[in-house]
Amino acid sequence: GVCLAETGHQVICVDNNEEKVKLMKSGQAPIYEPGLSELMQSNAKEERLVFTSDLAMGVENSDILFIAVGTPPLPTGESDTRYVEAVARGIGASLTTGYKVIVNKSTVPIGSGDWVRMIVLDGVAERKKESGTEIAAEFDVVSNPEFLREGTAIFDTFNPDRIVLGSTSQKALDMMQELYTPIIERKVAEDKSLPPVPVV
């Protein structure tokens, strides 16, 4: 999120941990990543970056919603996807009107786009049941796995060897291409003379 703000986008970072939100609002990164705190501070000062624990506010005020949560391994070796499920359900419960692209960046098994869509729809149904009102939620899901190394995540984000996008929706893919244009065109790359980043 911080790197997308650095490319000029308006970004709302949502975390359910109030202590982390307070830390991020103070300009401190909750993880060790060289240069991250400085990027957070400069983009918050430029009003391109906001931190909150209010998921509904983040959903309402965004066109593209990223699910970027941990998926620690279970004893079986499979990914623990409960945090992805909780966020997807929360997004569904917060959707109102207007088209949204929901992007899963978390490490999940291949084919999880349909699963994320189902969980979001469950969240929509729960909200509809609670409120008794019709909810016209329009959204598509994009899988966008990240290939970041701890300690060099900022460099890796701005200098990828490829960007991987998967979706059944061309509209969603077009929005993602537009979002990533500064990175694709190497505008924030260390070596700006390199050819455009391939999108696969």
Spans of features found by a protein language model:
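Structural/interface elements that position substrates and couple domains in central-metabolism enzymes
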Residues: 1-200
